[in-house]
Amino acid sequence: HVSKRAQATLFVHPNDHPYDSDLVQMNREGRVVAVHGKPHAEGIDYPNCVNAAFYLMENRLIGQIPVGISSDFGRDLFPRWASEHRLFAYASPEYIKDMGKPERHAEVERAVTTGKVSARNLTQPQRAIFLDRDGVINLDTDLIKHPDEMQVYAFAGKAIRQINQSDFISVVVTNQSAVARGLTDLDGIDAIHARMDRQLGAQGAFVDALYYCPHHPHGGFPEERPEYKIPCNCRKPSPGMLLAAADRFNIDLSQSWMVGDSPRDIEAGRAAGVRTIRVRTGHGAVPGPEPDFWADTLEDAVARIFTEETPTT
């Protein structure tokens, strides 16, 4: 809040019902550029970035609230203020939940008494399941460059929903060299991920965070973008994306997992120090280093993780 010189900072997170939630759209610097109040028009893709109704605001902005007029932050004020004031978003998997209804109050009460709320505080080490995207969550049609090419597997929503309901956070780490090849740009990648969010949200699932590498080390493509044709530490099999997430979310890598379909996913997981599962979807038949475990699909991989994490007597 202070470093951004924000007039207001909104706590945002994904949830399992984005279709009936107020959604916050921000730029790559975290500045809020739009707030889309519910209900949403059919067929519109928005990132699953939900207004959690928890704000830090400067007094001078509070003074902009109309006196004597009923105003809702999500519906009336933030959509207008996004273009007039410095609004920023703080995105986090930490536990924040509206408990204005009896059933939600009971759910929050259980989360407090079981220790889930305190465990999700980022001062505590987190466990993560890192997920490759193409061939794991969605059909790999080779260098997806348009939202219409995003087809989430039928089993992916159930699998990721099980992660959402567990003590793990879900983090997508994906190579997207279509940017370096000039087939799309960063806005195009964001649009593709918004489509993925909408498809997962329709299945009651979400990813807590997403990292992608737009680079590619080799030149020679007709429409390539030279600024992205560079060696980097983020492109798998390098572990840069996993390490960046670990730093941001205080992830204990020794207690975390990587699920991928390609050899580079397994190599990245090994380099980061997480346990690895390779699925047989996507590029699962390509020869490569042996993972810790094999699974047919993401759903099977998640089931295997939970089996391995369950203490035996």
Predicted regions: what is each one?
Residues 1, 24, 30, 58, ...:
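Residue-level signal for inorganic ion chemistry
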Residues 2, 15-18, 28-118:
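Catalytic-core segments of class I nucleotidyltransferases/pyrophosphorylases
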Residues 4-14:
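A short, conserved acidic/glycine-rich loop-to-beta-strand motif
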Residues 126-171:
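Active-site neighborhood of HAD-like aspartate-dependent phosphohydrolases
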Residues 138-154, 179-188, 202-203, 225-234:
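Metal-dependent phosphoesterase signature
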Residues 156, 160-196, 203-222, 269:
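Substrate-recognition element of Asp-dependent hydrolases with the DxDx(T/V) motif
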Residues 225-227, 233-263:
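Conserved Lys-Pro-Asp/Glu-containing loop-to-beta segment of HAD-superfamily phosphomonoesterases
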Residues 257-296:
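Acidic, Mg2+-coordinating phosphoryl-transfer loop and its flanking beta/alpha structural elements
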